Each structure stands twice: as structure tokens, then as C-alpha cells.
Amino acid sequence: YSNLFQTLYYVADRKYGGRLPIPVHCIMDEWPNVALPDDFDKILATMRSRGISCSIIIQNIAQMKALFKDSYESLIGNCDEFLYLGGNEKEGHKYVSELLGKETLDTNTYGQTKGRSGSYSVNYQQTGRELLTPDEIRLLDNRKAILFIRGERPIMDDKYDLKKHVNFRYTEDG
């Protein structure tokens, strides 16, 4: 990846005044298992201005944390989208639960006493709860995914079944 980004930056800066005329999108599968540029966090933070984007694919947050110890959160922060497909890692469950945030629950409590002067009361209370707890994230249906897009509310949706794609038959698995 080092040579790729050096070349793309060089061409964008020297030949096209800072931005590539045709956007380049890098799909970086098995990202933690390949040699990465030492300054990848800086590259990720500046590539958009040059017409370069990437999809970083990892199995779990722990892989990223092991590689980038102190800067892994800044790497995630430089990504406008985060797609969670499920997993079996406690730290990942907690992370996704925190990203989802909380919801407000309105609770009404009714009370009545019987007797001579009988009284009746209604209490309203608001409490907060995680949208999904880490345990609920762990038990997420395998057909579901959670998508986070910067500036938007999270979306839980069905995963796309690749076997339904018209060109699936042309793949190795088809």
C-alpha cells in the first residue's frame, strides 16, 4: 500500500493540482494482515481531498487496536461510515453498543389507595437505556448489519444475499 499511496498522492499533487480527475476507491480486505504505511493515520485523514477513498475491512476492533495501540480510535474517527456485520468479540460488542447510544423511556406509574379518603397518584419518569446492550449486540441476527454514517442515526438493515446477485454465477462460489 505504501507505493500505491505515494504514487496516487504524487500524481494528484504534481499532475492534477492536488486532486485526481477520476476518484480512486481502495478496498482493503484483510487490512490488519498486510504491510501498511507507517503514517497510515495521516494518509487516511488527507486522502479525501485528493479524490482517494478506501474501505478498511477488519475482523474485529482488537486487530486494529493491536496494530495502532494509541491511534486506532483516530483511524475509526476518520472513517465516515462504519459497518458492523456481527462478531464474537466482547470489546467490539461494547464499542458498537456505545456508538448506538441511548434511548429515553417514558414510564408511567399509577397508584391508588382505598380507604376513607382514597387517593390516586400518577408518576411520570424518564429513564435512559442503551439502544442495544453489548449482550444484545452479541446476539444480533446473522442476517442483520448495523451501519453508522457520520451525521446520521444508525441503521439496522438486512445484509445483502450475494447469491441473489445476477453475476453470482460467475464467481468461484457460484
Language-model features: locations:
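Conserved P-loop NTPase motor cores
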Residues: 1-122, 153-172
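Charged, amphipathic alpha-helical segments
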Residues: 122-134
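N-terminal nucleic-acid engagement/recognition segments and initiation subdomains in replication
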Residues: 137, 172-174
